[in-house]
Design a protein with these regions (language model features):
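Glycine-rich, proline-tolerant flexible connector loops at the mouths of alpha/beta enzymes
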Residues: 92-106
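Catalytic domains of carbohydrate-active enzymes, especially glycoside hydrolases
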Residues: 68, 72-93, 301-306
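Active-site region of glycoside hydrolase catalytic domains
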Residues: 1-57, 81, 100-102, 111-477
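Active-site mouth loops of central-metabolism enzymes
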Residues: 58-72, 149-152
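A short acidic, glycine/proline-enriched capping/turn motif at secondary-structure boundaries
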Residues: 86, 95-97, 135-137
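Short, flexible active-site loop motifs that bind/organize anionic cofactors or intermediates
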Residues: 63, 70, 101-104, 345
């Protein structure tokens, strides 16, 4: 194996709503994920089909305690440092800073919490990479405005960003505006706090909300650069190349269109304007986007510095409606099973070469540095009698993907800033709400029903990843 650059940012990634817990502590307000329950109602709520804006006694809400990192962050960051992390991607909970989403004055207790967390990272030489909004629209703003369908969300978000940039300049260099921004179209409540009234034009609402998030992202980039001249601000895409199921031209065209659709948001964030095909699509659908004077100029001026993305699997598509389903590779996006690939316990296609293909696709399209900010294997881990966890399957998955990253850097010449695996510590799954779908190098004693001691322990992959980082990616054995 060739080596990675000496300044390569190895690390791991989490999200506040999947790990922090303490959902009512420290002055924190309620956010969208807090009302997304575990069980059969989870997807209807996440998709905006079932309205739930408060918690009830009938449901279990995994995010309320999560893995209680709010009270364990020093212990957890020390474990990250033991692995040799150079970077830790985390998100700030909007409602921990502004409990109602648009409060004139921020919650000092929330600011102090993140200040302590960043100081703990710097103590070990770990660079924070901060996601400003990771599936956590403030409930107060959903009730007040209907979430991102309303233009006033842009100013609320810009105010939130300015509070953070002013407070944490000098402590945080790398920022992401929205996590997996393209998920707005697939999980509209999780992604943008959207609910749909009977008879409402769903596509109109989604694309209007998308425009508001894109304008907000551009505002955040401009604010960050004005307040912190050395800051680097990225977009974040749920990525994964679409393959045609066959070489029939119709399937090839379907795959090309699926890729193009997936790139819609970051086309705008990276190039500063709506692509022509998107304008045509919106026009054909009869969608009348409300744009304010100056929006187009703002999008041009607020382009991102780098492209970050999550990659778990590639996807396969076809024009044959009988082959399409929603259970092969991703429960959210339509896909068809790829007969050439094995799948994870949750049906996600395992395709390391697809990562290299995706990286080349993104760089060819945007010519901006890349950053892989999520990649990992969700699996059921068995704890042995002596407490050990032999997760060789996770090591195999990550090794194969790191090998393809090395090829992309050294053979294809791609500029890759870093790699933060998803879930360096077990946390609540965003899609299913499960704990048994584990990604971590660190095991957390907690089950799907919320029972457990929350004790942390090292898996075999912990020691493996430590060795990978220490060798700059050269020793993957």
């Amino acid at each position: 194996m060739g080596k990675f650059p000496k300044d390569f940012l190895w690390g791991g990634a989490t999200a506040a709503n999947q790990c922090e817990g303490a959902y009512k502590e420290g002055g924190r307000g309620l956010s969208s994920v807090d009302v997304v329950p575990f069980g059969p109602d989870r997807f209807p709520v996440a998709l905006g089909q079932l309205k739930m804006l408060d918690c009830d006694a009938e449901h279990f809400y995994p995010s309320h305690e999560a893995i209680d990192m709010y009270h364990h962050f020093k212990e957890d960051i020390k474990l990250f440092a033991e692995m040799g992390f150079r970077c830790y991607r985390l998100s700030i909970a909007w409602t921990r800073i502004l409990p109602n989403g648009d409060d004139a004055q921020p919650n000092e207790e929330g600011l102090r919490f993140y200040e302590e967390l960043f100081d703990e990272c710097h103590k070990y030489g770990i660079e924070p990479l901060v996601t400003l909004c990771h599936f956590d629209t403030p409930i107060a703003l959903i009730k007040k405005y209907g979430g991102w369908k309303d233009r006033r969300m842009v100013d609320a978000y810009a105010h939130y960003c300015e509070v953070l940039f002013q407070r944490f300049r000098g402590k945080v260099k790398y920022w992401l505006t929205f996590n997996e921004i393209n998920m707005l179209l697939h999980m509209p409540f999780m992604g943008a706090g959207l609910l749909f009234a009977p008879g409402e034009n769903v596509q109109q609402v989604k694309y209007q909300a998308a425009h508001h998030e894109l304008v907000a992202s551009a505002k955040a980039v401009k604010l960050a650069h004005a307040i912190m001249p050395d800051a680097m601000v990225g977009c974040m895409l749920a990525a994964g190349q679409f393959y045609p199921r066959t070489c029939a031209p119709a399937d090839v065209q379907a795959a090309a269109e699926a890729d193009r659709d997936n790139y819609f948001f970051i086309d705008v964030q990276s190039r500063g304007e709506y692509p022509v095909w998107a304008k045509k699509r919106i026009e054909r659908a009869g969608i009348a986007l409300q744009m304010e004077p100056g929006d187009e100029q703002l999008l041009k001026e607020g382009t991102v510095d780098f492209i970050s993305f999550s990659y778990y699997s590639s996807r396969c598509t076809t024009v044959d409606p009988e082959l399409m389903n929603k259970a092969s590779g991703n429960a959210i996006m339509d896909a068809v099973k790829n007969p050439y690939l094995k799948a994870s316990d949750w049906g996600w296609a395992i395709d390391p070469v697809g990562l290299r293909i995706t990286m080349n696709s993104l760089y060819d399209r945007y010519q901006k540095p890349l950053f892989i900010v999520e990649n990992g294997l969700g699996a059921v881990d068995k704890v042995e009698a002596d407490g050990s966890i032999h997760d060789t399957y996770r090591i195999d998955y990550l090794r194969a993907h790191i090998e393809q990253m090395e090829k992309a850097i050294n053979e294809d010449g791609l500029p890759l800033l870093g790699y933060t695996t998803w879930g360096p510590i077990d946390l609540v799954s965003a899609s299913t709400g499960e704990m048994k779908k584990r990604y971590g190098f660190i095991y957390v004693d907690k089950d799907n029903e919320g029972k457990g001691t929350l004790a942390r322990s090292r898996k075999d992959s912990f020691y493996w990843y430590k060795k990978v980082i220490a060798s700059d990616g050269e020793d993957l054995a």
